């Protein structure tokens, strides 16, 4: 585990990282003071930028993780069909809404400027919450979503464009929605029947 404060030009080892632990995914709080780490050996750890990492027992091992991009105290996690929320900078998590019948949540993406607005791509579809993950709405006609990202909106003062590698109405492809998933036009790019997250 290493940290950079200059856009990746240089890196400094985290002084509190445990020995022999590597890999996995990291989520950093909106203010940069808290780090949540889903490690390569399926541990869930949390720390500040200098303190020793401690295990998070209230989030299942191997969970998909993310941070809210506006609320520095909020982190998200997903495991199976369950979604989890932390309001204390990743120290503890409580269960929130459900992700249908999903068993593989692939990615959690938070709105860049609106707290509590979060998306989850899973093996059974694409899910959206506007209340910090307390409840979710499934996006219509999406039966599988391997990846999701939010990008620049099509015009000023609009919701971010949603890009998804997904299966919509039975057709796999790269899709874009410009109205928060209300409608998803024909796919952009190559079509396919399967993909990997």
Each PLM stretch: what is its role?
Residues 1, 41-45, 83, 126-127, ...:
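Hydrophobic beta-strand positions in blades of beta-propellers and related beta-sheet-rich domains
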Residues 4-8, 29, 45-50, 86-87, ...:
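Conserved Ser/Thr-centered positions that define the repeating blades of beta-propeller domains
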Residues 7, 31, 39-41, 71, ...:
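Short loop/turn segments that connect beta-strands within the blades of beta-propeller domains
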Residues 12-16, 54-58, 94-98, 137-141, ...:
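Beta-propeller fold detector
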Residues 25-31, 64-70, 107-114, 147-157, ...:
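Structural signature of eukaryotic scaffold interfaces centered on beta-propeller domains
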Residues 102, 140-149, 183-197:
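Conserved blade-ending motifs and adjacent loop-strand segments that build the rim/top face
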Residues 112-114, 121-127, 137-179:
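Loop/turn-rich, solvent-exposed surfaces of beta-rich toroidal or solenoidal domains
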